[in-house]
């Protein structure tokens, strides 16, 4: 954000919303001098309606000579956030757990059959007299 504020230093407002994590509990909205609730909340509303997380949306606004009023500001920030999200590449990631397990060599075929069916990411594997595998498994589907 500091980079954007420096780049657009002559703008009147740099309003934003962000959300981290999947539970929606870690977020922040900022109106940067606009009337309370007219900038950050509409931006955050677009983040929520698109079901996004681990995201920051910053809207830079220049004063164009016409006062927009409360509803005009809300609509302008909402539309700007909607536009940027519609034209952004959304990257989907899964939440994974890393598990490690050890088993006797005699069980290798059974273990590998299950791994082949479930197709987790194999992080590390070692096959000696006893075997060990570290897997990254998606927490939910």
Give the ranges of each region predicted by the language model.
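Short glycine-/aliphatic-rich beta-strand segments at the starts of folded cytosolic domains
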Residues: 90-105, 133-135
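Short amphipathic alpha-helix segments
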Residues: 102-120, 141
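Conserved mixed alpha/beta catalytic, RNA-binding, or beta-rich assembly cores of soluble enzyme
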Residues: 36, 40-49, 60, 73-77
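N-terminal positively charged helical leader segments and presequences
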Residues: 127-131
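Terminal, non-globular segments
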Residues: 135-137, 141
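Long, charge-dense
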Residues: 77-96
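Glycine- and acidic-rich phosphate- and metal-coordinating loops
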Residues: 53-63
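C-terminal regulatory domains involved in ligand/effector binding and gene-expression control
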Residues: 1-38, 124
